[in-house]
Amino acid sequence: MIILGVDPGSRATGYGLVDPSGGDEHLVAADTIRLADTDDHPTRLKQIYDALVDVIDAHGPDEFAVEMPVYGQNPQSMLKLGRAQAAAMMAALNRDLPVAQYTPKEVKKSVTGNGNASKKQVGFMIESILSAREQTFAHDTADALAIALCHGNRDAHDDGDSYTGWASFVDANPDRVSE
């Protein structure tokens, strides 16, 4: 199974493909899509979409994971980031890939064990997990690989049970609740 992780951005979008089959994570491909230096935001969105469609067609991933935008102080920046995420998701959806979303804290915790890890710590763990110490990844690329690994970790530990809240857990597991 190949997982495509994407770290969307309005200036650069990182992507990373990993294959977690067999318990060892293998690096398939990774890079950063540098977007044209233009003020025309729709053109950048098309570049993200087109580049990711090319990556999907070239590598045939089975699943797609993307980082959710974090809340910031600048509403315009948040809108641009959300649109970049949407362009990435549309590339996956138009190729019939299932889409998963993760917060930055979820990704960091999954890869480093610390939801507040620095970019340097994330990069170190990516190189270690993927046995890629001879490679240095740009931050956007390392983040995308971390997103793919996070998704792989989630799949590996998914027991099939999903709950929408405490009430649904109690309904599904009455024997595990004591009064």
Swiss-Prot record:
Query: What top-level class of enzyme does the UniProt entry assign?
Result: hydrolase
Cofactor binding, per record: Binds 2 Mg(2+) ion per subunit.
| GO CC term (a single one) | Holliday junction resolvase complex
| One of the GO BP terms on file | DNA repair
Enzyme Commission (EC) number: 3.1.21.10
In which family does this protein belong, per the annotation?
Belongs to the RuvC family.
- How does this polypeptide assemble, per the annotation? Homodimer which binds Holliday junction (HJ) DNA. The HJ becomes 2-fold symmetrical on binding to RuvC with unstacked arms; it has a different conformation from HJ DNA in complex with RuvA. In the full resolvosome a probable DNA-RuvA(4)-RuvB(12)-RuvC(2) complex forms which resolves the HJ.
This protein is called Crossover junction endodeoxyribonuclease RuvC
Q: Which gene encodes it?
A: ruvC
